Amino acid sequence: MRRVTVLGATGSIGRSTLDVMARHPDRYELYAATAHSNLNELFSICIKHRPRYAILATDAGLAGFKKRLRDAGVSTEVRVGVEAMCEASSASDVDVVVAAIVGAAGLVPTLAAVNSGKRILLANKEALVMTGRLFMDAVRRHGAELLPIDSEHNAIYQCLPEAGQHLSDMTSLAAYGVTRVLLTASGGPFRHFSQQQLQQVTPEQACRHPNWSMGRKISVDSASLMNKGLELIEACWLFDLTPGSVQVHLHPESIIHSMVEYVDGSILAQMGNPDMRTPIAYGLAWPERIDAGVQPLDLFSIGKLHFEMPDKERFPCLRLAEEAFSLGGTAPAVVNAANEVAVEAFLQGDIRFVDIPVVIEKSLLKGSIVDADSVETVIEADRVARQYASEAINELAGGVVVP
């Protein structure tokens, strides 16, 4: 029996994780579940899965939540704050930590799991984007077992030889004959929109992803291609690659989740229906395979698969992410922070969709990029970038009528 802490249990990744775990009650037990603000969903999780701990980001609604659990006869202990999340990630009773908190908020509890040498199912790409080498050095130093569960990175992982799957190893993938990684992207709902059409899109349109069921923030990131930019940075750190050896392909069907090219001309691809339970089940059970509850892929009904090159002129977020990785240091943390602030402003109706990359670029140009030599340095860069992004949004919002 493996005990699992799920950071971000009420989000789409967290719910998918719990669905897979519930299919295998003889293998997995929920140790702790964390939530930001969705207390109703966390209450349902406590009723169904009976975790030892339920952890809230803040004490908002704490008393009422505790009372609901008591009235329901649930003995789950309720705790609050980042420190409690870190303890749930590093507890000696915990075998697996699912890092599914969206954004920079997931960094500290994810690093707590790394520093405790846990098996970490990494969905929180921002933690790795922000800290890069610091994160991977900690994985190696503490003997953590890192398994990516972003569908694309999990696909790359599955296409590697067994010897190349040990991400704590310093060996370059070139030693295993890998020449290129082909990172796929759906292209989002605006793939064929003109620049004029992009100026008119609404948050509701941006959140309607054509293939995946995701949260609002990541749906907007997918629509802007920033999600793919962050994933490119994540792939470079996870697999010790350069941006030149990672090629982004738009693949609107979202059936091939990524590919790995080898020196002999072979390309291995991981395929499947777009359902996050597949990579989650892979991470939970690795090196075994378990039922994820996902429908088998019917290639006859699909018929054709399509590929396109991304347009970095219409979708400059991908270019900005690439530039941030090339700049190095705290630049990726700056881009990530500015994007989080800009996306929230777009969702609130304060700026247009096309203003998101403008805010990011202004923040990147204004910020002082320094060596990411400590977590504290990265967190400070994140804080300052958020301030710059807010200033840029205030400037833009002054003369913008948002549809």
Swiss-Prot record:
Catalytic activity: 2-C-methyl-D-erythritol 4-phosphate + NADP(+) = 1-deoxy-D-xylulose 5-phosphate + NADPH + H(+)
Stored Gene3D superfamilies: 1.10.1740.10, NAD(P)-binding Rossmann-like Domain
PANTHER family reported for this sequence: 1-DEOXY-D-XYLULOSE 5-PHOSPHATE REDUCTOISOMERASE, 1-DEOXY-D-XYLULOSE 5-PHOSPHATE REDUCTOISOMERASE, CHLOROPLASTIC
Binding site for Mn(2+): D150, E152, E231
Function: Catalyzes the NADPH-dependent rearrangement and reduction of 1-deoxy-D-xylulose-5-phosphate (DXP) to 2-C-methyl-D-erythritol 4-phosphate (MEP).
EC annotation from Swiss-Prot or TrEMBL: 1.1.1.267
Keyword set, alphabetical order: Isoprene biosynthesis, Manganese, Metal-binding, NADP, Oxidoreductase
Keyword Cell inner membrane: no
Transmembrane intervals: none
Name recorded for this polypeptide: 1-deoxy-D-xylulose 5-phosphate reductoisomerase
Pathway: Isoprenoid biosynthesis; isopentenyl diphosphate biosynthesis via DXP pathway; isopentenyl diphosphate from 1-deoxy-D-xylulose 5-phosphate: step 1/6
Residues reported to bind NADPH: T10, G11, S12, I13, N38, N124, E126, G215
Biological processes per GO annotation: isopentenyl diphosphate biosynthetic process, methylerythritol 4-phosphate pathway involved in terpenoid biosynthetic process
Family designation: Belongs to the DXR family.
Annotated binding of 1-deoxy-D-xylulose 5-phosphate, by residue: K125, S151, E152, S186, H209, S222, N227, K228, E231
GO terms of molecular function: 1-deoxy-D-xylulose-5-phosphate reductoisomerase activity; manganese ion binding; NADPH binding
NCBIfam families: Dxr, PRK05447.1-1, PRK12464.1
Swiss-Prot/TrEMBL cofactor(s): Mg(2+); Mn(2+)
Entries under InterPro entries matching the protein: DXP_reductoisomerase, DXP_reductoisomerase_C, DXP_reductoisomerase_N, DXPR_C, DXPR_C_sf, NAD(P)-bd_dom_sf
